[in-house]
Amino acid sequence: LAAKDNNVAGLLIAGEIEAGIVQLNELRQAIVKFKESKKPVIGWIENTSQREYYLTSVADKIYMHPASEVELKGLASYNMYYGEMLKLFGVGVQVTKVGKYKSAVEPFLGDKMSEPAREQTTQLLNGVWNRLLTDVSVSRQVTIASLRRAADDAGIYNAEKAKSLKLIDGIRQRDELITELRKIGAGADESGTSFRQISLAKYAHKVQLPRRGERIAIVYAEGEIVDGWGGVGEIGGDRLARDLRELRADPRLRAVVLRVNSPGGSAFASDIIAREVGLLRNKGIPVVVSMGDLAASGGY
């Protein structure tokens, strides 16, 4: 929508963001689509984390504050193990699990990661890291090998070094960034000291989508799956099943997008939800599942 909006001169990627790699990748894809409009996309770095840089790297130009740093250090997984400590207190743990890769309970059983858990974690991290490097390489027009060296050599870089590594395009103070943004068409704000801007959240709120006619429902399944109704941040099996049942009865419904971001949980609640999804499909209503950062166990 912003790509077609004549009131939008361009896009600025800046600030902190709390999101997983999957969500950031989806944002990157949306920005790549926005760039087809030929409107400029500018990235701004002030002490940026690796995840934030991954998103920012999609910009046409990236500017960095001279006193800030940027991370590019690779991925790692750290786990705590309590098995030996529990034994000291006379606490025994009995677990029933299916398959050698079901590692969620390992922290309560021993004092180190099992080889199957290490194998699957390593494979996951390598896959995500390779995707991240590939995306940054394409956006920044640098080799994957050079990005690997940057991550191995230090992992955190100041502005001058980041520029020499081609992680950024230029070094600017905040007032100089404002000047750059005005050059690409951003008008001055009411105070005359900054530029006219609107956040993504406020822009999405202002945009009016059609409310009549046929519908596609977007259902969010976010959090741990629990029996019953569930609370804030949980997927209650009964509650989500009821929502899906009500959608099935809506004559205007043409499809359902089920957004899953869950580590799993209750097998019973998961089965109740899966049954309602199946009934939607049996009625001829397409169900498209969009997986977020987590779609594990019952979530899958």
Where are these regions (language model features)?
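Extended, domain-scale alpha-helical bundle/helix-rich regions
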Residues: 154-157
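A ligand-binding cleft/hinge motif common to bilobed small-molecule-binding domains
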Residues: 175-183
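Short acidic-hydrophobic, aromatic-tinged amphipathic segments that line or gate anion-handling sites
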Residues: 63-64, 168-174
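Small-residue-centered hinge/linker elements
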Residues: 1-152, 182-289, 293-300
